[in-house]
């Protein structure tokens, strides 16, 4: 067994390579100067005694949206402290909140914490209108300029009550600005016209990073995180990176893999972080292309496992039906026998049976998220064929446990597949 403190490491500061924004936030985003200037323009009225503009920030995951807003609101707060400006910024992460009601409860809590300090409880048992009035009351108690940032606002779905009512609330003595951050590029277009009018016209789009930009981002992270890694002539880009830890192809491969899909910087950073950890855990002194490829395979498997574990019931039952045929050695298998087995599982688990068409949609959802492989039918009337995109043991091990919803069905499958229930 290894002893703590006895091992050499290639890390100088591991946190800098951690993709978790709560662990490390960069002090600048050189690739996003245009977008930061647009955010600056929307917030600048606050420095002139006016109300900052409402703003919607768009972009796919890992494009710097949240970090960009935090950098500019932090900068504005520093200005406010120096100029004795009355400014309050409230950040709400909406992921996991399925409507305006939950966003309002968290907003009440955060505003109370701005007034009284940490530890305030979420309000419960109130009507939506009452919660809105509680928000307005707390805004008026806080006073001054208040910027409310709603991150991942698309999580609330079609329930845009807060987006309509809050910008129109006009609390006394408050200059209120609402900033929505979303991964949904069609978010604004899907809102009602009245809601779009309430939010105003300002918007900022974060386009996907390209491979060159990702190389520069990874280079800056590497310099902060790794020993014997630096920029030549103090020029902070990949071309001036010098490292005794990273081989020449390590960062280009991580950047290329990150750029392949959506230009997600977080995914590229996660790849390099995992690759570097593989090398460091084995007491190796260099991080190579092979470490990056190993990291890619590892993270893809972990993502699929996590995706299986969090599937909604109907998708889980569809996956179980395909898994059943995988155990029998019958895959790839057409839709009809999968649907037949799905109905059997629904009856066993006392779950409503979807129509054949809606069931096919669930199979396609699983294929779109790389849980299933899909083979298109060759012509009209030919059914699509499906098989597991992961090995059978991985699928079985990540189905619900015996004590969980659908666990009884999963236990039967694991017994048939020769995998012990854990």
Task: Enumerate the language-model features and the residues they cover.
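A short, basic N-terminal segment
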Residues: 1-53
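Terminal-proximal interaction/regulatory segments of ATP-powered molecular machines
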Residues: 332-422
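Conserved catalytic segments around the Walker B and adjacent sensor/switch elements
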Residues: 55-56, 79-96
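Walker A/P-loop nucleotide-binding motif
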Residues: 51-71
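Short, hydrophobic-biased segments on the C-terminal half of alpha helices
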Residues: 73, 163, 360-364
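Mid-core helix/loop region of P-loop NTP-binding domains shared across ATPases and GTPases
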Residues: 2, 96-108, 112-201, 206-217, ...
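Short alpha-helical segments that sit at the start of domains
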Residues: 300-321, 325-332
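Conserved C-terminal helix/linker of AAA+ ATPases
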Residues: 278-299
